[in-house]
Amino acid sequence: MASSRAAKSLPLQVAAICYRRRGSAIEFLLVNTNGGNKWTFPKGSTDPRLSHSQAAEREAAEEAGAIGTIEPRQFHLYLHAKGVFWQPGGVQEFVVKAFLMEIHQMRRPDESNRKPTWVTPDEAKRRLSKGREVKYLRELEAVIDRALERIQFHNELWGSYPTTRTSRSSASV
């Protein structure tokens, strides 16, 4: 997890860790990066007019067409890097606040090049690992593990995710 010192000195992004239930199985929603050669969670910049969870929810809708219930508080903080590692100065690090979001509906994403794809937790880890340095890969694996723990917690406590706020759309998951 990102240290508090790093969190204070790096730019901030927000991510929606989108999931759905398929019977007793959990699937995560990944999108292609802008370059198209890596997979990631829907994420992006904060907006002073929105809470961080609302900004993450916006990213899920724009990049993946995902509509659902997002937790108002982050469940994890992780480091992410953009750029190319083999060029000096080619990488920008970010601290990312991760928000868990259960998806109820899908629509056409605003960013059509993102190719939203549902995958198992193991497949998510495999896809997230491609083309990444080990330290960032471990950060993303930890996001999946923490998300699964949180989902299990919700299942044990409430029997499912507590529905508090759901956006609207025309297509179901």
Question: What are the residue ranges of the model-derived segments?
Answer:
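Short connector loops at helix/strand junctions that flank enzyme active sites
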Residues: 9-14, 34, 91-96
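Short, charged/polar surface micro-motifs in flexible loops or helix N-caps
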Residues: 22-24, 35-38, 47-48, 79-82, ...
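Conserved Nudix-box catalytic region and its N-terminal flanking loop in Nudix hydrolases
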Residues: 25-69
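Short aromatic/basic micro-patch
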Residues: 40, 93, 118
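Active-site segment of metal-dependent pyrophosphate-handling enzymes
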Residues: 61, 65-107
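NUDIX/MutT-family hydrolases
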Residues: 98-141
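Charged phosphate-binding loop/patch that engages nucleotide di/tri-phosphates or the phosphate backbone
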Residues: 129-173
